[in-house]
Amino acid sequence: MSRSDTDGRDTSFASRNGVGGSQLSEPPSQRRERPDYGYAVEETHRPHTAQERFPDSHGQRSAPDLYSRDSDRFSYHRGDTLTPAQERSYQRELELMKARGEQERSYGGASASRSSRPLEADHHYGGMPLTRGLVDDFAPEPMASSGRPNLEGFSRVENGRRYRLVVVQHPSRARMCGFGDKDRRPLSPTLIVKLIITEEATGEEISPCEVNTSLFLLATDLCHPDDLMLAPRNILVHHHASSLSSNPIQHGGAGGYATDEFGHRSGSSLGNFAADGGGPCDDGYRSSTHPQHASESTGAAALPLSSSSMNPYDRSPHASSSIQFGGGGNFAQQSQAESYTRNLVGAAVASASVLKDEQDKWCTFFVFQDISVRTEGVYRIKLMFVNLEVSGRVGTGVADALAETYTDAFTVYSPRRFPGMLDPTPLSRKLASQGIKIPVRNDKKKQRRRNDEGGDGMGDYDGASGGDEDDE
């Protein structure tokens, strides 16, 4: 802005407040020399800011200034003629003040006391005030209690029939079987589950003889005894780390390929792949390559190597390693391998058996007489029932769970702390007499064997699949 424009504004300001001469043609330099020249008594002697000299428009003002009631930024005199821009700014200010008053009357002055954290009344979405959960950082709603698994499980209806699982015999103890391939330590007592099918309309129980149970399956899984939302306890992770330092073998070939001790390129040292090269082979019973037969040429990048699992039983090995080169030509091979082992071993999935119970009533039973736990601890067993003969889904490989339940918590002991197997229950004896292989002792045979000179009374079980009397 030029000096002449500034002098003109000062002239207008002085004449408006009644100070100085009334002749507008008086030069500003002569007017400043008069003793009565100056500010009014009620005015504060301070320099004019840019905003006071040139009132900014609505879009250039900050948000708090829009709601300032005592601001003198838009104080106009009634006798003055307003420019079109000033008139529009004045109208906007009036509209904002009216809207502010309406908001305070509607919400009880909640926005008068503003804090660093906004209130619910200040947040709107589609004309409706937001809830506290959405205002607070728009956090997701917590999972409903109905979505969490509970010990009661669930029961579903399929084709007008409701399927429900009832654990008629809970295991209470077991001896850990360790990581051997053939060692089995059955649960005591044997886990027995009954399936009940009822008509949804009438609630009448359907006889197992009227139902095709050939495709009924019941799957088991280990879980935490208290918190069912924790990670399943059926997977054991083993970490194996090794470090090997040796001298590399120099070859004249191109870098980037793994070569064996005879100088030939070997693609198998990069991993165990199928014959077509499409992906890694997932055969858990076949060992992979030998890292000591692979080496890297000078200047090659670090390539992954695979290692075999220590025990192929029920394991899916995943290994990775890298080769690090040193300044002196030596390199150190450091590998980190992980192998996964099932903690629940044996026949973890059982098919249905239509048998008579203690009252000679036909029922659908699932018997788990050949499952063991590798490590000691406290567990629950999760039971999920599926019917593979669902109409319209046969052969798809996918089946929905129709029922679910959990056993009571049981303890798996170490060999030194195991208190021994419990006596067979009447239900176990009843099912064993119908051909189910449940380890049930026959006291008469055991006594007759002990009286025999050549016998030691070991391993006398009806239904015959093995128990362990050494534990008692």
Curated annotation (Swiss-Prot):
GO annotation, cellular component aspect = cytoplasm; nucleus
Q: Under what name is this protein listed?
A: Velvet complex subunit umv2
Q: What is the lineage of its organism?
A: Eukaryota, Fungi, Dikarya, Basidiomycota, Ustilaginomycotina
This chain is encoded by the gene named umv2
Q: What is its main location?
A: nucleus
The biased composition feature labelled Low complexity covers 106-116
PROSITE patterns linked: VELVET
Task performed by this protein: Component of the velvet transcription factor complex that controls sexual/asexual developmental ratio in response to light, promoting sexual development in the darkness while stimulating asexual sporulation under illumination. The velvet complex acts as a global regulator for secondary metabolite gene expression. Component of the velB-VosA heterodimeric complex that plays a dual role in activating genes associated with spore maturation and repressing certain development-associated genes.
Subunit composition and interactions: Component of the heterotrimeric velvet complex composed of laeA, veA and velB; VeA acting as a bridging protein between laeA and velB. Forms a heterodimeric complex with vosA; the formation of the velB-vosA complex is light-dependent.
Q: Which PANTHER family match?
A: SPORE DEVELOPMENT REGULATOR VOSA, VELVET COMPLEX SUBUNIT B
The protein's location, in the record's own words, is: Nucleus; Cytoplasm
Q: Which UniProt keywords apply?
A: Cytoplasm, Nucleus, Sporulation, Transcription, Transcription regulation, Virulence
Q: Where is the composition biased (Basic and acidic residues)?
A: 1-10, 29-59, 67-80, 89-105
User: What did gene disruption experiments reveal?
Assistant: Leads to reduced virulence.
Compositional bias annotation for Polar residues? 286-298
Name its species.
Answer: Mycosarcoma maydis
Return the annotated region ranges for Disordered. 1-121, 281-327, 433-472
